[in-house]
Amino acid sequence: MLFPSLVQDDFLNDIESVIELSKKLPFKGPTDDFFNKINGGWPGERTDCLSVLNTNFYIYFCSKVLKLYYPGEIICFEAELYFQRIPSTFNFPGWIHQDSNQLSAVCYLSNHKDSGTSLYKPKNFYNVYSDAIDKLKKKSYRDSDFSEESAAARDAWNNKFDCILDVPSYRNRVFCFEGSKYHGVKNFTSENTEDDRLTLICFFQKIEGNIKYPAVESRKI
């Protein structure tokens, strides 16, 4: 493990301006070419990458996340950053999965307290994320497949894991974790609000510089 899981509250300097920015951008869902082009499999809608839509905000957000790990270093990075919006009607749990990137970050922008992110570990070491599971996950999100058969497949897969950490989705909180960690959302809706769930999601593909990894340095003592 190179990146410890990390939670930071009051992350954005001006969350209201960030929310207003999201309202000015087009969101794309399962029927859009964008979704199929990148072979995406997620619930709800996303914007295009903010590196294209708003470069200054993209650099601000990604740099701010990396400063949580490397406060004194100048870091070069490659990352994807999106707004994601999930409708309040999406009253289903998500699929437990892994990301292919080095570091992931989720920033919660809406008032959903009960739809945070959870980390998991397999009950058996040989329960590995496979192409077959990934295809089922993507199909259920892409086709809005909420059938009993799809739910049974999701639950059968999710039941192979034990939850090791629940992070509530408090507004303006960022949660960072290694992409290889199994993670998921137990519920995309929350009893305290009927608004759509709005987040910023960031995937760091490459992080370079004169880096000392916190977990590695800790093990030297």
Explain the meaning of each model-derived region.
Residues 1-94, 117, 123, 132-135:
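Non-heme Fe(II)/2-oxoglutarate
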